[in-house]
């Protein structure tokens, strides 16, 4: 066992003494050492219940003959960080989380890991760090929050964000907004729709890194505790059988995750996180081109929030991710191994129930095209991303004058102030990975646009990114970003922007010579942050089309 390096032999008497100071017995030191990576915190609703899940995991580890060592890493709530400087730290926190998992596992000689993440950046961050260790690992995602209810109608966090815009437009009163605010998030769990956290949980299961039904099993249920306990038992078997990440995370496993993502219409943030996770297996193992290639293989089969009517609880009751895999069976790579010990094909064979009103058959989909689309053109030579499944079909093609803003705050003030007209294309730049720095989510401006009823006539384009809760014609991840001298940096108010989601095009309606002349005159602005973690991050981070990972060179 790897743990022998810290516990075996005469020279390791001091190491054993320190472990005994923690209360571990000689008998416990003989067993496989399993690191239980928790991300409990009292400030993130998706993580406030994770101590209970960790306890269940540890019981499972001991039940199967392992010894559990729990430690923590950080977790940022994107919703609380939204709309202010705090959001600059969200995406960069993914790299810190990866580093902490790698560091703790390597320093203490663990034989395997159980990861307990829940929200947006914590899921990919933990997985990235675990891959670096080369150790067997299993993921127990914290589970979704139930939707809130008021007078027979269901609500979630996005209801509150959009309520702000509706209130600003005079559609609802402040008292009505307060009512929604009070009930929309009723307790523990990741926000109730197919936003980034739940999307990443679904893709983690589709990749084979979680037990079946883990992704959609809700946060505070006994079912989640049982899955956690079984995961603890299962990691000991993975260690004994040396089922390392390379045996599970094949190219085909990543393709399964992307196919599920495209079919469900998941968060656009997956186009950052899946390439970043794959990059830990092999550089450029998965790129935007893979999303583009696979988008032609599956339709959009589930009408889930924010673009649709159903919540994750509906997806779970309809059969969860195994049912989604079953519906996509003809396209899924069924030979892929999972942490359950079964292949994806074997999991598919065990599916007994599918509610086709929620998970639609491929011959009767929600939309004929996949839920995400990669756009390229003179405004985004290296690519941009849109959740087409959450866009009003009237906006699939759109031409309009640019309204240019160099920060999210400026754009939100203009939108809520009534300065944006129907037909406009709002451009928010210098919000990319390096320019922000941190590539903030633009949920406040997109929710304001939707809440004010402009999402059928106003598009938003940014080198920043969007919350998984964003809906409407929101095109993000424009690459190269403005801070890198991409064409988005030279857009001027009134320039016509052409959007064609059907043909995957995003163009600035200027001739090539004009674009070249403007780019030649462009001067890189001073960094917004000059000290601390964000300053270091801005210097090392790669482009959004490369997953916004940190460069080693």
Swiss-Prot record:
Q: Where does Mg(2+) bind?
A: 78, 120-121, 441
* Name of the top EC class for this enzyme: lyase
EC number from the UniProt entry: 4.2.1.9
The GO terms this record gives for MF are: 2 iron, 2 sulfur cluster binding; dihydroxy-acid dehydratase activity; hydro-lyase activity; magnesium ion binding
Q: Name one GO cellular component term.
A: cytosol
Question: What reaction does this enzyme carry out catalytically?
Answer: (2R)-2,3-dihydroxy-3-methylbutanoate = 3-methyl-2-oxobutanoate + H2O; (2R,3R)-2,3-dihydroxy-3-methylpentanoate = (S)-3-methyl-2-oxopentanoate + H2O
Superkingdom of origin: Archaea
Q: Which cofactor does it need?
A: [2Fe-2S] cluster; Mg(2+)
Protein name per the record: Dihydroxy-acid dehydratase
